[in-house]
Amino acid sequence: MLPKNYDPNEIEPKWQKYWLEEKIYKYKLEPDKPSYAIDTPPPFTSGTLHLGHVLSHTWIDIIARYKRMRGYNVLFPQGFDNHGLPTELKVEKEFGISKDQPEEFLKKCIEWTWQAIEKMRAQFIRIGYSADWDLEYHTMDDWYKAAVQKSLLDFYKKGLIYREEHPVYWCPRCRTSLAKAEVGYVEEEGYLYYIKLPLADGSGYIPIATTRPELMPACVAVFVHPDDERYKHLVGKKVKLPIYEREVPILADEDVDPNFGTGAVYNCTYGDEQDIVWQKRYNLPVIIAINEDGTMNENAGPYAGLKIEEARKKIAEDLEKMGLLYKKEKITHRVLRHTERSSCMAPIELLPKKQWFIKVREFTDDIVEVAKKINWYPEDMFLRLKDWAESMDWDWVISRQRVFGTPIPFWICKNGHIIPAREEDLPVDPRFDKPPVEKCPVCGAEIEPVTDVLDCWVDSSITPLIITKWHEAIKGDEEAKKWFEHNFPTALRPQGTDIIRTWAFYTIFRTYMLTGEKPWNDIVINGMVAGPDGRKMSKSYGNVVSPEEVIPKYGADALRLWTALAPPGEDHPFKWEIVDYNFRFLQKLWNIYRFAERHIKDFDYEKYKHIELEPLDRWILSRLHRIIKFATEELEKYRFNLITRELMTFIWHEVADDYIEMIKHRLYGEDEESKLKAKVALYELLYNIMLLLAPFVPHITEELYHHIFKEKIGEKSVHLLQWPEYREDRIDEEAEKIGELAREIVSAMRKYKNSHGMPLNAKLKHVAIYATDSYEMLKVIEKDIAGTMNIERLEIVKGEPQLEEKVVEIKPIYKRIGPRYGKLVPKIVKHLQENAEEIGRRIKEEGKVEFEVEGQKVVLEKEDIEIKKAVFSEGEEVETAVVRDATILFF
């Protein structure tokens, strides 16, 4: 027998252990079964899962469990993205090891990462995540790095990889280059500095406006709009930069916004992307004034060695002393920052560096065309990828100046020739491994290793190829070929809105260039998790909630329901009250099955399932099968929120509040045939509800299955059963009308009992229901209404009741008449009681009443008295309630 209370902390770990021990989710290659491969996102190994992980991976788990129940052979691996700057920072801090000791440093990075993986895997298991852990992969594994490097060699052979000096996004704090997808603009308060630049011929000044006066040493031109009447006459002249006494030209370009600041700007190498465009467009010189560490270099003259912020302040002060800084305006503007890592968020500089690139800009049209062949959920997320592809200014920077990462498998000579690693040597680390040749095969020069490592998106952008064993299949492995052919393209890529322009974009590009195919059939996008206050979760806001705070209190299933309520593609705030409601829903579900267990556990459903059912049974099963159809259709579209709401409402209200309450009298009654029919319907209803809920709340459904159904069915897990089958023959519109009417009648009677302080199971002696259009339906459910509401005598009467409203009591409002009539009040009260009906009529018609008491005239307005009326039917007082065309009389 199920215990009285639902305790997730007892049942959830039990079933998690059971699933692992019994290998319930073990993947086996079965070519005869349809494949469903999921390209799961490998989270960065930070050591802990946040609620964003819980949301996205619960969605994935719901899909995997559903597809297994639909008969698919579900390939559901889970990987971990290991490389990255945060790990290096952790190792430096915790172990005190410098990157100048690369071999020892790498060992500690790997050691720390394994600890993080163990913690995160345990957290995944604790939320009921049903991956096949035998297929777990790690981007730091040698075989994984070999696959990544093999893909790089293929790209190199195609002429897609090159090395050149180019302005790159540079993070001075992290000391590395970044891809465009790793940076973003943040709205911040700052200053706009208005500076007069002297004309070189001494004829005057041109005013410019800039947010970065510290970049003056890198100024190579001043730009104005060609149609700006204020400055047309100055185009072609030169200005002499104050402090540096260097002359630069004044040029005209249509990209200048004449409404910003003064309408004139200076072009520095490099303040922003526009500076790059102008430098290349006009073949201007390049002057760099900022070091990699965010300090000013020797080109900054007197400001060399200062941090950027210090130099900005100092040069502004000096220009003001010279009379050239004439205005400083506080503004809100966009600042480019390292937004991909919230632990950094440092301002980004654009520095020219020798970096490694993959050609991608020339393929953006191809990428968009491939993306069109993928089903996007929601559809408008495709536009984000398209917009990103069309906005790219330069190719993909794939090199990073770090230690812990997949090594770039190349050597270079002093003349710039690239020497790739041999495929048979992969994985290689040029920092430590012997090169494939002694000298450059092109020019004979000495060669040196490439010490940069790859951007982590290079690792993770081949995950659909990794999980389908492309890297083994291309070597000729026959088993891997079968695996690849069965599972590629993968069925699904689930991911967040924040990485459409990185993970989705680069995966489509890389997979297409390596295979000529799309990586997946479907892509489903979840939004970000916000804090309880609706703002982005942040320690600075104090609104961060971790899974470890939620699960001990409410369990994983209640938290999973919160994730399932998130709309696709939209941000979803964490709300404690929603999780609390979910927990109460699960307790309600538990109570339903606990009640039903004694009636259906030993019931032979197969023997009686074809019996003709009663109207309310047909109603609830018709509603059930509509839900089955709806849930199946919406799951195919990944709209979990719609299904979850529909299921929870159906179970809590139609099933628990109404149907079960309306069949209790049959289950405990003496009519054996009626009892049998109720059991058939109850079994079918609860068995299918359990299956519908299984992907969403896997723990409680497993517990219910083992308690009530396993003995008869035999399968060792609810998650190995088939998804409910929609039956058209169960749809009964007439029964649905009857069921809805029954719900409304019972609801009205419950309100009556509640208003009189009666328990819901209290007996009602006499109730009559008068109806016209609904009379026949009411006759059908007469016994159910009487049994449900414990009515001793229930009449269903065709027609309308003859009702008469009478005044039964009139009471004075003492605080109004007391001061006016004093000692006469008792006699006034007596007069009111003896003439209640007449006084009530006169008050209604005239708004007041006049009479004499002991010779004194009494005048009472309607505000002076309280009139109580009652309804009578055939001389007997009744209370009434109206439901549609039916009038309920309570005697």
From Swiss-Prot:
Domain of life: Archaea
The reaction(s) this protein catalyses: tRNA(Val) + L-valine + ATP = L-valyl-tRNA(Val) + AMP + diphosphate
Transmembrane residue ranges: none
Annotated motif 'KMSKS' region, positions: 536-540
Binding site for ATP: K539
Disulfide bonds: none
Any one GO molecular-function label of the UniProt entry: ATP binding
Predominant place of localization: cytoplasm
'HIGH' region (motif): residue ranges: 43-53
Keyword terms of this UniProt record: Aminoacyl-tRNA synthetase, ATP-binding, Cytoplasm, Ligase, Nucleotide-binding, Protein biosynthesis
Entry's Gene Ontology BP terms: valyl-tRNA aminoacylation
EC main group: ligase
EC number: 6.1.1.9
CDD domains named among the record's database cross-references: Anticodon_Ia_Val, ValRS_core
Cellular component aspect of the GO annotation: cytosol
Compartmental location: Cytoplasm
InterPro entries from the UniProt entry: aa-tRNA-synth_I_CS, aa-tRNA-synth_Ia, Anticodon_Ia_Val, M/V/L/I-tRNA-synth_anticd-bd, Rossmann-like_a/b/a_fold, tRNAsynth_Ia_anticodon-bd, Val/Leu/Ile-tRNA-synth_edit, Valine-tRNA_ligase_type_2
Function text: Catalyzes the attachment of valine to tRNA(Val). As ValRS can inadvertently accommodate and process structurally similar amino acids such as threonine, to avoid such errors, it has a 'posttransfer' editing activity that hydrolyzes mischarged Thr-tRNA(Val) in a tRNA-dependent manner.
Entry remark concerning the domains of this protein: ValRS has two distinct active sites: one for aminoacylation and one for editing. The misactivated threonine is translocated from the active site to the editing site.
Protein name per UniProt: Valine--tRNA ligase
Organism: Pyrococcus furiosus (strain ATCC 43587 / DSM 3638 / JCM 8422 / Vc1)
This protein's encoding gene: valS
